[in-house]
Amino acid sequence: MNLATSAETAAAAPQAEGNTPFYKLGGHETIQRICNRFYDLMDEDPAYAELRAMHAPDLAKMRHSLAGFLAAWSGGPRDWFQDNPGKCMMSMHKPFVISKAVAGQWSDAMKRAIGDAGIENADLAKAMGGVLEEMAQGMARD
């Protein structure tokens, strides 16, 4: 399964409803479940302490923003791109010094969250985790 890896690709005209990873994953409900689990893991598991320290104490805004990005990125409603014109995850994280270790924490927590989301299509879930891991590793600067 091929998923978009850039904001430019993801911002292209959406496909017909039901034909994109967003809909195949289960839509907003599944995307929000992934994001909530991701941030819960970051809050609860000491393995993600360095990653957690890079975020504000209140993760509510991040939960909403990441869910919006993942929805748009995976072929759902384009609201995140319309609300953040010209931005992508890479440009938004440029001010942060992200090590390979922190990128690894991010991708591990995200893959766990995807795995815990109860996605029926295991191949799609694995592909999503893999592409997001590549994106996270692409932000590392060491």
Indicate where each model-derived feature is located.
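Short glycine- and Lys/Arg-enriched binding-loop motifs that mark or flank ligand-binding interfaces
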Residues: 22
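Heme-based O2/NO sensor domains and their adjacent alpha-helical segments
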Residues: 5-19, 32-119, 128-129, 133-138
